[in-house]
Regions:
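Short, strongly hydrophobic alpha-helical membrane anchors
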Residues: 1-20
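Short cytoplasmic-facing helical segments at TM-TM junctions of multi-pass membrane proteins
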Residues: 118-157, 187, 227
Length: 229
């Protein structure tokens, strides 16, 4: 096994290639998990406080406006610019701007509003009649979310998260350009800077395989959830 890991492919050791792939999966996995948490909160705020939503009033209108503007502003900033701009914040939170863990700060900040908009669209697929029926039965806001809104749109939300995961994969590759590690770092350091075209092609193939796997798994889970509704 050690002999295999120390052998080389296109000028780099297999161990280095596997390590960078693991770093990419680490960034995408944790970034998606944390981003989904914040993204879902933002999405629920947008859905519940929008005009005609479950929660109405002056405060809800202000909250909707603030969250809506925040989501639009962050989504309008290219990830590379966001990555560099919030370096002081990343250093403040993580103590460094280098490494896969430090890269989670800009990745989460980037993906949360992106997922919020995707999840908002999914949640809006729930028929207004279902929400009205829930309110007629005396369900409170939490019960509407837990027993009506989420179950009805879970399959669609899985597809939204699949799209978000693929976007996060691309962002994680860009994180490598500022020391985030992963496949992007491998492409820049050992591929582009050393004019190693075969290695660059290999990293592209790896990313394509990752995307196909994410899309396949997301689609399969979504179909299963829709079938059991």
């Amino acid at each position: 096994m050690n002999e295999f890991l120390n052998s080389k492919v296109f000028g780099i050791k297999w161990s280095r290639l596997l390590t960078n792939c693991q770093q990419t999966l680490y960034m995408v996995g944790w970034g998606l998990l944390i981003g989904t948490f914040f993204g879902l909160i933002l999405a629920l705020v947008l859905v519940l406080t929008r005009k005609g939503g479950v929660i109405q009033g002056k405060v809800s209108r202000i909250l909707y406006a603030v969250v809506n503007v925040y989501v639009n502003v962050i989504r309008s900033v290219p990830f590379v610019i966001l990555l560099v701009t919030i370096m002081p914040l990343t250093r403040l939170i993580m103590g460094t701007t280098i490494g896969s863990t430090a890269a989670l700060v800009p990745l989460v900040l980037y993906i949360s509003p992106y997922l919020a908009r995707l999840l908002e669209n999914s949640l809006l697929e729930c028929s207004p009649g279902i929400i009205e029926a829930a309110q007629a039965m005396g369900a409170n806001t939490w019960q509407i979310i837990r027993y009506f809104l989420m179950p009805e749109t879970l399959g669609s939300m899985v597809l939204a998260l699949t799209t978000g995961a693929i976007g996060l994969l691309g962002a994680s590759a860009m994180a490598g350009y500022v020391g985030g590690g992963g496949v992007g770092d491998l492409t820049l350091t050992y591929g582009y800077e050393k004019m190693n075209t075969p290695l660059m092609i290999l990293t592209v193939v790896i990313l394509v395989v990752f995307v196909q796997l994410i899309q396949f798994l997301g689609g399969a889970v979504s179909r299963k959830l829709r079938a059991h509704r």
